[in-house]
Amino acid sequence: MAKGKDVRVTIILECTSCVRNDIKKESAGISRYITQKNRHNTPSRLELRKFCAYCYKHTIHGEIKK
């Protein structure tokens, strides 16, 4: 049997430029991706470059809390 917490956890990645532009109401929404990460290999917050459908370009998507 496995000991402790699960190694793989589900995380949500959110567009950082949409969050900043949300104050100005320039974008129609906030782009989010759902993925998994291995807690032992990447203990820090994950940041990936993904396509944002609201900005129409590739931007940095950072991990957010659930």
From Swiss-Prot:
Keyword Chloroplast (UniProt): yes
InterPro entries tied to this protein: Ribosomal_bL33 (IPR001705), Ribosomal_bL33_CS (IPR018264), Ribosomal_bL33_sf (IPR038584), Ribosomal_zn-bd (IPR011332)
Alphabetical list of SUPFAM superfamilies matching this protein: Zn-binding ribosomal proteins
CC terms in the record's Gene Ontology section: chloroplast; ribonucleoprotein complex; ribosome
Pfam families: Ribosomal_L33
Keywords assigned by UniProt, alphabetized: Chloroplast, Plastid, Ribonucleoprotein, Ribosomal protein
Annotated compartments: Plastid, Chloroplast
GO biological process: translation
GO MF terms, alphabetically ordered: structural constituent of ribosome
Organism domain of life: Eukaryota
Family, similarity comment: Belongs to the bacterial ribosomal protein bL33 family.
Protein name: Large ribosomal subunit protein bL33c
Annotated organism of origin: Lepidium virginicum
